[in-house]
C-alpha cells in the first residue's frame, strides 16, 4: 500500500519506480513496482497510469530504472544507444494518441545518439539517459505550476472579474495525470489558492470515470469547493449560467489548434459555444505537434469494448446486452474554432483579431522554443 499524501501518481528514486494504480481509486490506494520498460508498457496500456504528461514521464522513468540495472552490459556506446532507442519505440506503442510520449522519446533518442558519438563507455550513454529522464520529472511540476498561474491570471482578465469564478472540467488533468499539480486542474488549483474560485464542476467522464474517480478525489483532497455532474448534464449546467468557463487538458494539439482530448470534450466545446461559455485548453508545449496541420491527422486510440459492456470502466460486472457491438474511441478532436485560448507554461496562445485563428508556430518562435520542437 502506498501513502497518498501529496497525491503522487509517480514515486521515483534512482533505480526504483512505483506507480499509483489509478484503476483502484478512490477506494483503494495501491502502488505497483515498475522494474523495466515492459512493466512500464503494461502499466500505461492497462491505465494504471494515465494522462498525457504522466505516461510520458512514467515511460521515460521505467526505462531509466531498467538501464540503471545494466551493470553487466558489454556492448559499445553505439549499441547502448540502439538499445535505448528500440526500448523507447516500444514504449511509444503503448498509447499512440498522446504526443507527449512520442515527443519525449524523440528527444531522448536524440540525446543518446549524440552522446554515443563522443563517449567511449556504454555506461555513459545510460547515465546520460537517466539524467535526462529525471530532469523531465522535475520540469513537469514547474511547468504545470506555470500553466496554472498563466491560466488563472488570464481567466481573471478575460472574464473581467476578481472573484467568484466557477468552471467545469473534464476527465482528470491534475496531480494524478502529471508529475504533480496538473494542467487544467492546475489552473483550478491556482484559481482556488488565489481566492477567486467559487466552485469547480467536474464530469464523470465515462466510460472509465476519470472524473468521478480521480478528479473528484483530488478536489476533495485539496478541499476545493466542487460538484460532480453526469456527462449528460453539462449542457444544462451551462444553460443555467452557473459557470463562466470550461477548462480541459489535451493529449495532442495540431498546428492549427485542433485538440485531441478525452472523449466527450468535443461535446462540451459545442455546448459551450452555443451557451456563450468560454472554452480553454490547458497543456504543456510538449502536447503541441507542429507536424500535423490539423486534427484530421491525429490517430485516435480505440479502447476495449469491455469498458462499455461492463461496469467500473470494464472492471466490473456486465451491464450491457450480450451480442451488442461497441464503438469506444478514447479521444475526440475539438476544432480550433470552438477553443477560446490555449494555456501553456510559456503563456496563453490567443487567436489573431484579423481572422480568429491560432498561429501556434509564431507563438513558439516568439518563446524561442521552435528549434527544440523540430
UniProtKB/Swiss-Prot annotation:
GO cellular component: cytoplasm; nucleus
Family: Belongs to the eIF-2B alpha/beta/delta subunits family. MtnA subfamily.
Catalytic activity: 5-(methylsulfanyl)-alpha-D-ribose 1-phosphate = 5-(methylsulfanyl)-D-ribulose 1-phosphate
Reported function: Catalyzes the interconversion of methylthioribose-1-phosphate (MTR-1-P) into methylthioribulose-1-phosphate (MTRu-1-P).
Subcellular location: Cytoplasm; Nucleus
Highest taxon of source: Eukaryota
Listed GO MF terms: S-methyl-5-thioribose-1-phosphate isomerase activity
Enzyme class: isomerase
Protein name: Methylthioribose-1-phosphate isomerase
Main location: cytoplasm
Alphabetical list of Gene3D superfamilies matching this protein: translation initiation factor eif-2b, domain 1, Translation initiation factor eif-2b, domain 2
Pfam families referenced in this protein's UniProt entry, alphabetically: IF-2B
EC number: 5.3.1.23
Site residues (Transition state stabilizer), renumbered to this chain: 171
Catalytic site: 251
Induction: By iron deficiency in roots.
This protein's UniProt keywords: Amino-acid biosynthesis, Cytoplasm, Isomerase, Methionine biosynthesis, Nucleus
Any one biological process term the GO annotation gives: L-methionine salvage from methylthioadenosine
Pathway membership, UniProt: Amino-acid biosynthesis; L-methionine biosynthesis via salvage pathway; L-methionine from S-methyl-5-thio-alpha-D-ribose 1-phosphate: step 1/6
Amino acid at each position: 500500500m502506498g501513502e497518498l499524501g501529496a497525491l503522487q501518481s509517480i514515486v521515483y528514486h534512482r533505480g526504483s519506480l512505483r506507480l499509483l494504480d489509478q484503476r483502484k481509486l478512490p477506494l483503494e490506494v495501491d502502488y505497483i513496482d515498475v522494474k523495466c520498460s515492459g512493466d512500464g508498457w503494461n502499466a500505461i496500456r492497462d491505465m494504471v497510469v494515465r494522462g498525457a504528461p504522466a505516461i510520458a514521464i512514467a515511460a521515460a522513468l521505467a526505462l531509466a530504472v531498467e538501464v540503471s540495472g545494466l551493470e553487466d552490459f558489454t556492448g559499445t556506446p553505439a549499441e547502448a544507444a540502439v538499445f535505448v532507442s528500440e526500448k523507447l519505440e516500444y514504449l511509444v506503442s503503448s498509447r499512440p494518441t498522446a504526443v507527449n510520449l512520442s515527443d519525449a522519446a524523440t528527444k531522448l533518442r536524440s540525446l543518446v545518439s549524440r552522446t554515443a558519438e563522443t563517449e567511449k563507455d556504454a555506461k555513459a550513454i545510460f547515465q546520460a539517459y537517466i539524467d535526462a529522464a529525471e530532469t523531465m520529472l522535475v520540469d513537469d511540476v514547474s511547468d504545470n505550476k506555470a500553466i496554472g498561474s498563466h491560466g488563472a491570471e488570464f481567466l481573471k482578465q478575460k472574464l473581467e472579474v476578481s472573484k467568484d469564478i466557477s468552471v467545469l472540467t473534464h476527465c482528470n488533468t491534475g496531480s494524478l495525470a502529471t508529475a504533480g499539480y496538473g494542467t487544467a486542474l492546475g489552473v483550478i488549483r491556482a484559481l482556488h489558492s488565489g481566492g477567486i474560485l467559487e466552485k469547480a464542476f467536474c464530469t464523470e467522464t465515462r466510460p472509465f470515470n476519470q472524473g468521478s474517480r480521480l478528479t473528484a478525489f483530488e478536489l476533495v483532497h485539496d478541499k476545493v469547493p466542487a460538484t460532480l455532474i453526469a456527462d449528460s448534464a453539462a449542457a444544462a449546467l451551462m444553460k443555467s449560467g452557473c459557470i463562466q468557463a470550461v477548462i480541459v487538458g489535451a493529449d495532442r494539439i495540431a498546428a492549427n489548434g485542433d485538440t485531441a482530448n478525452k472523449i466527450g470534450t468535443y461535446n462540451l466545446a459545442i455546448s459551450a459555444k452555443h451557451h456563450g461559455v468560454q472554452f480553454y485548453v490547458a497543456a504543456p508545449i510538449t502536447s503541441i505537434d507542429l507536424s500535423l496541420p490539423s486534427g484530421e491527422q491525429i490517430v485516435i486510440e480505440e479502447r476495449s469494448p469491455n469498458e462499455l459492456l461492463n461496469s467500473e470502466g470494464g472492471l466490473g460486472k456486465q451491464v450491457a446486452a450480450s451480442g451488442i457491438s461497441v464503438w469506444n474511441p478514447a479521444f475526440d478532436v475539438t476544432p480550433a474554432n470552438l477553443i477560446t485560448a490555449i494555456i501553456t507554461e510559456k503563456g496563453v496562445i490567443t487567436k489573431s483579431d484579423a481572422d480568429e485563428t491560432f498561429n501556434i508556430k509564431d507563438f513558439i518562435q516568439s518563446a524561442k522554443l521552435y528549434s527544440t520542437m523540430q
